[in-house]
Amino acid sequence: MDRAIRRNDIDEKALLRKLILEKRRALSDKGRREKSLAIQQRFFLLDEFRQGRVIHLFLSFRGEVMTDGIVKEALALGKQVVVPVVVGGSEGMNLSEIRQYPEEVEPGAYGIPEPKKKFIRRVDPATVDLFVLPGVAFDVRGGRLGYGAGYYDRILGGTVPSRESKRVSLIALAFELQLVDRIPSSVHDVRVHKIITEERVIECMKSGMY
C-alpha cells in the first residue's frame, strides 16, 4: 500500500512539474522581467533580507525568477552571498561564496550559472541565515516541488533541523502561475517559510520539521 502511494506521488510530481514548466516557459521575456522586478521589490522589504548577513541566492536559469538585481544589491550592502555549485555524486551540491557578480560566474553543470573554478570558496550550509530557493511549484503550506534531483532537500535536511542556536529562514521566489493547491510531499521534503510572488508575500503554515 505504502509503495503504491509513493508511486502515485512520484507520478503526480512528474506531471505537475511538466505542466508548470510549460506554463513558465510560455511567459514572455517582458512579462518575466516585470514580474521578477515586482518580486525583487517585495523581497527587499523583508526583515529576513535586511537583517541577514549570510544569504544563499540561486542564480536564475532559463525561466526562473530573475535574481541578478538581488545578488547585486546584497553584495552592495556588504552581505556574504552564497550560491549553489552542482558537484554530483553523493554530495550533489555544495555552496560557494561569490564576491563579484557577474564577473566570477560562468555556466556550469547543465548550463546553470555558478562560480568559476578559480573563485570557488566553499561555505558550510550551517552558517547561512537565509536560504532563497528556486523551485518548479509551491503550495501555500510551504510545499515545494523542485526539479527532481533533491539537492536542496539533502543540503537543508542535513543541516537545518540540527541548528539549535538560531533559526534559518527558507524563502521561495516564484511567479503566481507556479502556485498549486497541493504539492505531494514526504517527510524528507523541505518546506519553505515564505513565498514571494509578483502579487503578494505568502506566510506559509509552519511545518513539523521547523
Predicted regions and their residues:
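Surface-exposed, charge/polar-rich loops and edge strands
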Residues: 1-11, 22, 76, 101, ...
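N-terminal active-site beta-alpha-beta segment that forms phosphate/nucleotide-binding
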Residues: 2-127
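A residue-level signal for conserved active-site and pocket-lining positions in enzyme catalytic cores
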Residues: 20, 57, 81, 132, ...
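Short beta-strand segments
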Residues: 58-60, 84, 133-134, 172-174
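Flexible, active-site-proximal loop/turn residues at the rims of small-molecule/cofactor binding pockets
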Residues: 61, 137, 201
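Charged helix-capping and loop-helix junction motifs
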Residues: 72, 147-153
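A structured binding-face within diverse protein domains that lines the active/interaction site
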Residues: 113, 134-136
